């Protein structure tokens, strides 16, 4: 680390900027940077590329902010305020938010299915009722039956035989409405991304502290920004890849709709397991 300080003092630190970007990319590939969790979240909500980019940038923003907060706090508040001492608490806080998100995803999917099943049962009940009521009037029965059936299905753009597919299209439209055009839901995506980037990087904090101590504040900010840019490239690529893979699979595989209907359950369980894992590590670190 002494050689690095010497290079900075000689003004050669700017040569490390490309290396900082590359290290950020590689750093994003390391375990513990929420790539699996983010991909699962994008798949669960059938997220668009725009939402995947938003998720990755939010995670990078929080990751960078944590580096600055810990570095500056460590300098001006206390020597004990290090990345090693803060990381367990951040892991525990992240675990709580992640578990809450997983439970919300699971509940939202279950509620959507229950609402569809209730609506489908109500449709069948109305169909049987009309049939029994108009049994003695063949002309009226045919007219009422066709009219009621058409009125129920036409907004979905499908026939009774394809009603399940119509529901899936309606469910996809509901997801699009919830996660594309609403401020509240975009806030949920941003919150999830910000939570995913709360774990600090000791290497980035160390570089920033060295630059600040050597009065190379601008260089330190640039190095951290370059590092964060590389991290953003990795996280955004993972999210966009998940979003595109969902879209392509839906076009090429007819059975994908059935799998996609169950995917949010598996995704919420996977995200929940990640939250439990982070919570255990955070709790263990606090107790040490």
Curated annotation (Swiss-Prot):
Residues 122-166 are annotated as: Disordered. It is a multi-pass membrane protein. Residues 34-51, 107-188, 245-265 are cytoplasmic. Signal peptide: none annotated. Induction: By nickel and cobalt. Transcriptionally repressed by RcnR. GO terms for cellular component: plasma membrane. Residues 1-12, 73-85, 210-223, 287-288 are periplasmic. The chain crosses the membrane at residues 13-33, 52-72, 86-106, 189-209, 224-244, 266-286. GO terms for biological process: cobalt ion transport; response to cobalt ion; response to nickel cation. It holds the Pfam family NicO. It is found in: Cell inner membrane. Keywords: Cell inner membrane, Cell membrane, Cobalt, Cobalt transport, Ion transport, Membrane, Nickel, Nickel transport, Transmembrane, Transmembrane helix, Transport. Residues 122-155 have a biased composition (Basic and acidic residues). GO terms for molecular function: nickel cation transmembrane transporter activity. Efflux system for nickel and cobalt. Belongs to the NiCoT transporter (TC 2.A.52) family. RcnA subfamily. NCBIfam families: PRK10019.1. This is Nickel/cobalt efflux system RcnA.
């Amino acid at each position: 680390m002494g050689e690095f300080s010497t290079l900075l003092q000689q003004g050669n630190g700017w040569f490390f900027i490309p290396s900082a970007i590359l290290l950020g990319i590689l750093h994003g590939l390391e375990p513990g940077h929420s790539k699996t969790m983010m991909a699962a979240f994008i798949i669960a909500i059938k997220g668009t590329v725009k939402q995947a980019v938003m998720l990755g940038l939010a995670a990078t923003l929080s990751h960078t902010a944590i580096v600055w907060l810990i570095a500056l706090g460590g300098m001006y508040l206390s020597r004990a305020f290090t990345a090693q001492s803060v990381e367990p608490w951040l892991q525990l806080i992240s675990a709580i938010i992640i578990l809450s998100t997983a439970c919300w995803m699971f509940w939202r999917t279950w509620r959507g299915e229950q609402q569809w099943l209730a609506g489908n049962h109500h449709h069948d009940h109305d169909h049987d009722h009309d049939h029994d009521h108009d049994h003695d009037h063949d002309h009226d029965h045919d007219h009422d039956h066709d009219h009621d059936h058409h009125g129920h299905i036409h907004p979905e753009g499908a026939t009774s035989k394809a009603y399940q597919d119509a529901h899936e299209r309606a469910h996809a439209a509901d997801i699009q409405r919830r996660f594309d055009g609403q401020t509240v839901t975009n806030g949920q995506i941003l919150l999830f991304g910000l939570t995913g980037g709360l774990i600090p990087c000791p290497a980035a904090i160390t570089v920033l502290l060295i630059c600040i101590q050597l009065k190379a504040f601008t260089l330190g900010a640039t190095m951290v920004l370059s590092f964060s840019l590389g991290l953003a490239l990795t996280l955004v690529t993972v999210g966009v890849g998940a979003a595109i893979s969902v879209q392509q699979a839906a076009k090429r595989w007819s059975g994908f709709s059935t799998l996609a209907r169950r995917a949010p359950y598996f995704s919420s369980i996977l995200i929940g397991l990640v939250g439990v894992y982070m919570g255990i590590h955070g709790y263990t670190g606090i107790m040490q």
